[in-house]
From Swiss-Prot:
ATP binds at residues 29-32, 86-90, 414, 493. It is an enzyme of class 5 (isomerase). Together with its co-chaperonin GroES, plays an essential role in assisting protein folding. The GroEL-GroES system forms a nano-cage that allows encapsulation of the non-native substrate proteins and provides a physical environment optimized to promote and accelerate protein folding. This is Chaperonin GroEL. Pfam families: Cpn60_TCP1.
Length: 547
């Protein structure tokens, strides 16, 4: 396909128009008095959101050149969201500010490659300063504040997330699901839970709740299919003599083996529950190993040269309690060695850091949570489907932001930290266009505070100058229209969010500034592609002549 090209100033101006289109759509949502954006859906109700990345993802421009600029800034929002879970609007605003300020200097003759170097050095210095300004998150109250702000000043959501994090710990899994009721609630599952239930309803111990509860049971863990009772008979006899119940986790238990276990349960001779092993393939082996480490048992597998017939009672795991329902099995207080469990957790953490696949990362995170803490489910309820989607989205954002805060600490919110970090740039002794690059960043750092004030109906430039003249940590509370100590007032941002927004914005803006040529597909002109080579009626006329 033929290509069209644009060069130098033309190219950069086209990119600027694209950046502005996307950034202006996202900008309206910034701050406590920011507005919402309504996104049309191909089917169903439209989505109403104030989440920067959701808006950015919907934007695709008709003009190829402008679209390149818009897509580059969209990536800034997406990357910030992936890393920190929030701060997407701030990142977009910073990218636009750095790019526009940089364009003026490039047009005035500055070398974009040297400017880029100056911008990078400025950002490096600012990241160090943000680290210095951050304060660790301590206590449930602080966690609750961060979550509430990220969820659009919703204190109820803040409390729920703080409670969930307190119960399952930093490594626990907190998932957000839709509730069938109007209210929003929290369910916590302690211990290790996996999604496999009993193989026969005759195994239940509580017929009302249809669940089996085993107190202080032995746990047999194997990746084999058990169909012949003779394979496990010696083991069953030893467990029966101990008077303890037994949980069997195997690839499957079927035929004669299952029938024998059920008959013994009904007669009251021996209490045993069988469940299928969780997961599939290599993931199943890893999960069985997790269960073995948690309960202090061994996986009886032929990979290790172990056979069921030769298994000893010392190879079985133990737990304080096991509850099995039709769908789930929960192991509470496994008897595994805490040192072994910690080593396993470290190993899974390393795998999480090294994996490139989002799916694998999610599954590893689940395994980590099951070993380290537990699982909490926030069930979101609302009056209408549109409100439900919006609320669920807000809670997911708040959850990511809260995790980021626990990880790297908190800084003053409302763009205040970016202005507080400006004096640190004076320590950089650079010259020429590198110094200009630093000045570009210095000016761009004012953009978030200016915009928050503008969106709340105040004069942005006046507010920026006032924040600059105040002590560090004093910022503008746009909701109440007053200058306050941001951290004491609970207006805070996770340091990771502020850092990621700045790094991603500067990276994209600097790349756009160094652009000298744009190449895009040439738009097809429908008129020129018509029947130019074959005038209308030419062929029938010719045919008539031949006849």
């Amino acid at each position: 396909m033929a290509k069209e090209l644009k060069f130098s100033e033309d190219a950069r101006r086209a990119l600027e128009r694209g950046v502005d289109t996307l950034a202006n759509a996202v900008k309206v949502t910034l701050g406590p008095k920011g507005r919402n954006v309504v996104l049309e859906k191909s089917f169903g109700a439209p989505t109403i959101t104030n989440d920067g990345v959701s808006i950015a993802r919907e934007i695709e421009l008709e003009n190829h050149y402008e679209n390149m600029g818009a897509q580059t800034v969209k990536e800034v929002a997406t990357k910030t969201n992936d890393v920190a879970g929030d701060g997407t609007t701030t990142a977009t605003v910073l990218a636009q500010a750095i790019f526009k300020e940089g364009l003026k200097n490039v047009a005035a003759g500055a070398n974009p490659m040297i400017l880029k170097r100056g911008i990078e050095k400025a950002v490096q210095k600012l990241v160090e300063e943000i680290k210095e300004l951050s304060k660790p998150v301590e206590g449930k109250e602080a966690v609750s504040q961060v979550a509430a702000i990220s969820a659009g000043n919703d204190e109820e959501v803040g409390k729920l997330i703080a409670e969930a994090m307190e119960k399952v710990g930093q490594d626990g899994v907190i998932s957000v699901e839709e509730s069938k009721s109007m209210g929003t609630s929290l369910d916590v599952v302690e211990g290790m839970q996996f999604d496999r239930g009993y193989l026969s309803p005759y195994m239940v111990t509580d017929t009302d709740a249809m669940e089996a509860s085993l107190e202080d049971p032995y746990i047999l863990i194997t990746d084999k299919k058990i169909s012949n009772i003779q394979e496990i008979l010696p083991l069953l006899e030893k467990v029966a003599q101990s008077g303890k119940p037994l949980l069997i986790i195997a690839e499957d238990v079927e035929g004669e083996a299952l029938a024998t276990l059920v008959v013994n349960k009904i007669r009251g001779t021996f209490n045993c529950v069988a469940v299928k092993a969780p997961g599939f393939g290599d993931r199943r082996k890893a999960m069985l190993e997790d269960i073995a480490i948690l309960t202090g048992g061994q996986v009886i597998t032929e990979d290790l040269g172990l056979k069921l017939e030769n298994a000893d009672i010392s190879m079985l795991g133990r737990a304080h309690k096991v509850t099995v329902t039709k769908e789930d099995t929960t192991i509470v207080e496994g008897a595994g060695d805490s040192k072994e469990i910690q080593n396993r957790i470290k190993q899974i953490r390393t795998q999480i850091e090294n994996t490139d696949s989002d799916f694998d990362r999610e599954k590893l995170q689940e395994r980590l949570a099951k070993l380290a803490g537990g699982v909490a489910v926030i069930k979101v309820g609302a009056a209408t489907e549109t409100e439900l989607k919006e609320k669920k989205h807000r809670i997911e954002d708040a959850l990511s932001a809260t995790r980021a805060a626990v990880e790297e600490g908190l800084v003053a919110g409302g763009g205040t930290t970016l202005i507080d970090a400006i004096p640190a740039l004076d320590e950089l002794n650079l010259e020429g266009d590198e110094a200009t690059g630093v000045d570009i960043v210095r000016k761009a750092l004012e953009a978030p505070v200016r915009l928050i004030a503008d969106n709340a109906g105040y004069e942005g430039s006046v507010i920026v100058e006032k924040v600059k003249s105040e002590d560090k940590g004093i910022g503008f509370d746009a909701y109440n229209g007053e200058f306050v100590n941001m951290i004491e007032s609970g207006i805070v941002d996770p340091a990771k969010v502020t850092r990621s927004a700045l790094q991603n914005a500067a990276s994209a803006a600097a790349m756009l500034l160094t652009t000298e040529c744009l190449v895009a597909d040439k738009e097809e002109d429908n008129d020129s592609n018509g029947n130019a080579g074959m005038p209308g009626g030419g062929m029938p006329g010719g045919m008539g002549g031949m006849m």
